[in-house]
Amino acid sequence: MTTIIDGKAVAASINGAIKDANAELQEQTGRKTGLSVIIVGDDPASHAYVGAKSRMAKECGFFSVQHTLPKETTQQELAGLVHQLNADDGIHGILVQLPLPEHLDADAIIQSIRPEKDVDGLHVANAGKLATGDLESGLISCTPAGAMVFVRRVHGRDLSGLNALVIGRSNLFGKPMAQLLLNANATVTIAHSRTSDLASICRNADIVIAAVGRPEMVKANWLKTGATVIDVGINRVPAPEKGENRTRLVGDVAFAECAPFASAITPVPGGVGPMTIAMLMANSVIAAHRASGLKVSERLSKLISG
């Protein structure tokens, strides 16, 4: 029988532990976890994401500040704000919502964030620690970290003998996801737009993780029976059954046809999405504890690392 992984429920358990960890931090140090979120421009999707992150930060009891900047903000102005937040001892995490307007150099901004405050896990220092197998002293990119929680819940901490396929090679997800799987002893294949005969490669995988932005690309006849399927895609497709010009969210996996063949599968929405925000909150409270020379509770550590 297929297990439909409930991302909202898993995220809720982690968020509860984060709230407790923040309360313990405040009791020991007199300070809350401080998270600053920066958004530039008026993209509706970005504002929706930032709103969800800010609300969750407040639910966790954080000191949360949102900086909403106009689209015309210059590189110098944005860099100045990041510099100011880097120097603020009350801010433990800095998140710059991507994408930025085209005239801004996003990579330069991300790399200007102090690594210990880079709660998105995108700084080269954090990426480098992950690449060398250091999962303890850096901050791990949120979506791969959330997907890995699901994998561990199904397969445990040691993935020895399992074949894992990551479809997508982005710096934001595909590469860090592959590193996490490698660190857990899986045999990892990364597929991408130049991969030939992807379906046959997929049929050999015990774990399939799709993150390419192609609606319902992974079909049932691609899957090995009993595979674990983690769908990271978020795509809007026409939904005429809902009315004119209406859309619905789907992932990169054809969920309805793939679910009967999988042992465990994440839905879209309600799968990886809630976990991304939960892992952002986890990184923030971890950063706050480290800034005070403390470690987070064993309960939270077990929930996020298995």
From Swiss-Prot:
Its EC number is 1.5.1.5, 3.5.4.9. GO terms for molecular function: methenyltetrahydrofolate cyclohydrolase activity; methylenetetrahydrofolate dehydrogenase (NADP+) activity. This is Bifunctional protein FolD 1. Catalyzes the oxidation of 5,10-methylenetetrahydrofolate to 5,10-methenyltetrahydrofolate and then the hydrolysis of 5,10-methenyltetrahydrofolate to 10-formyltetrahydrofolate. Keywords: Amino-acid biosynthesis, Histidine biosynthesis, Hydrolase, Methionine biosynthesis, Multifunctional enzyme, NADP, One-carbon metabolism, Oxidoreductase, Purine biosynthesis. The keyword NADP applies. One of its GO terms (cellular component) is cytosol. The keyword Ribonucleoprotein does not apply. The gene is folD1. NADP(+) binds at G168, R169, S170, S193, I234. Pathway: One-carbon metabolism; tetrahydrofolate interconversion. Homodimer. It catalyses: (6R)-5,10-methylene-5,6,7,8-tetrahydrofolate + NADP(+) = (6R)-5,10-methenyltetrahydrofolate + NADPH; (6R)-5,10-methenyltetrahydrofolate + H2O = (6R)-10-formyltetrahydrofolate + H(+). GO terms for biological process: L-histidine biosynthetic process; methionine biosynthetic process; purine nucleotide biosynthetic process; tetrahydrofolate interconversion. Belongs to the tetrahydrofolate dehydrogenase/cyclohydrolase family. Pfam families: THF_DHG_CYH, THF_DHG_CYH_C.
